[in-house]
């Protein structure tokens, strides 16, 4: 918990991917008041026309689709704060405008999350 999937329709430099992972994990940890050792992040790069977002009229300016699987019970305020901070940071790193970004949250019970050495049904900061 959580798994944050970032789909983007451009190629990223390795340093940009590292910055994204660092920022996403730190932001999630701060906003959700949790540790970082259980955060999973996937970055998937696609060619320009392999991602679509209806409000984007020119896909060459970029599209970012973010799917966040997280534990049930987070407040709307936490979710809004996370969305805003992630979009702003991703825009700064990728130069894709926030209007080209879309965030989806999927909630799970704690027992749905597992690391190699433990279930994450009961966690502590």
Model-identified regions with their sequence ranges:
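Interaction-mediating elements
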Residues: 1-125
């Amino acid at each position: 918990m959580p798994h944050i999937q970032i789909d983007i329709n451009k190629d990223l430099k390795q340093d940009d991917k590292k910055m994204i992972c660092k920022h996403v994990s730190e932001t999630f940890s701060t906003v959700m008041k949790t540790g970082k050792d259980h955060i999973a992040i996937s970055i998937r790069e696609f060619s320009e026309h392999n991602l679509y977002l209806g409000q984007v009229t020119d896909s060459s300016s970029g599209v970012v689709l973010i799917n966040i699987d997280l534990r049930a019970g987070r407040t709307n305020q936490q979710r809004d704060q996370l969305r805003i901070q992630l979009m702003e940071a991703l825009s700064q790193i990728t130069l894709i405008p926030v209007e080209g970004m879309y965030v989806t949250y999927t909630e799970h019970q704690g027992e749905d999350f597992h690391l190699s050495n433990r279930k994450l049904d009961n966690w502590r900061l």
